[in-house]
């Protein structure tokens, strides 16, 4: 189950693996808030294995509240599901609302699969280096089998990612401030357009 809209490649990845995606619609009228528990439950069957969220959401930018994350946690517990949480954009939050990682949800620690990427945080578009992080040993072993069946990410991407991870934190703060300034400028300009 995924919220819709969401990152377009989720659907392609799922189809290529033989999985079925069940979308739960969000809407612009309420700012893309998480749909009700009942909307999720309408999609849950005995074949449902996971809920996949992107937090903050791509493409809407919506950041789930603590209450919404607790609702997802409760669904995961109630139906014995996994929660896959793509948190690649967590360093790109420009509001005062707190960011709640799926890893901070008590009671489902063994059911959380966190997805991360260096390309978003370090502006490395096209460098496909990321991480799948879980405390679940069975999921970890299954992922390792898949990883060992493949070769490896391109060497140049690995070198770039390693270098990026050594970047001083001050640089990331400067980049954040620059993006925040650009965001605020764009919002100011859009607000000056009648009807927008």
Regions found by a protein language model. Give the residues of each.
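Structural detector of well-ordered beta-strand residues that form the stable sheet scaffold
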Residues: 1, 22, 84, 113-115
């Amino acid at each position: 189950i995924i919220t819709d809209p969401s990152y377009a490649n989720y659907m392609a990845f799922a189809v290529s693996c033989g999985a079925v995606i069940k979308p739960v619609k969000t809407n612009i009228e309420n700012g893309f808030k998480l749909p009700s528990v009942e909307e999720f439950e309408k999609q849950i069957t005995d074949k449902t294995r996971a809920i996949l969220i992107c937090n903050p959401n791509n493409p809407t930018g919506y950041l789930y509240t603590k209450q919404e994350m607790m609702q997802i946690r409760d669904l995961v517990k109630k139906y014995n599901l996994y929660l896959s949480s793509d948190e690649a954009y967590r360093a790109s939050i420009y509001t005062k609302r707190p960011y709640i990682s799926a890893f901070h949800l008590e009671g489902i620690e063994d059911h959380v699969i966190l997805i991360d990427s260096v390309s978003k945080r370090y502006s490395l578009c096209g460098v496909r280096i990321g991480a799948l992080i879980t405390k679940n040993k069975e999921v970890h072993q299954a992922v390792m089998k898949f990883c060992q069946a493949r070769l490896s990410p391109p060497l140049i991407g690995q070198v770039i990612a390693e270098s990026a991870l050594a970047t001083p934190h001050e640089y990331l703060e400067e980049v954040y401030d620059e993006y925040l300034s650009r965001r605020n400028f764009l919002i100011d300009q859009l607000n000056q357009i009648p009807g927008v």
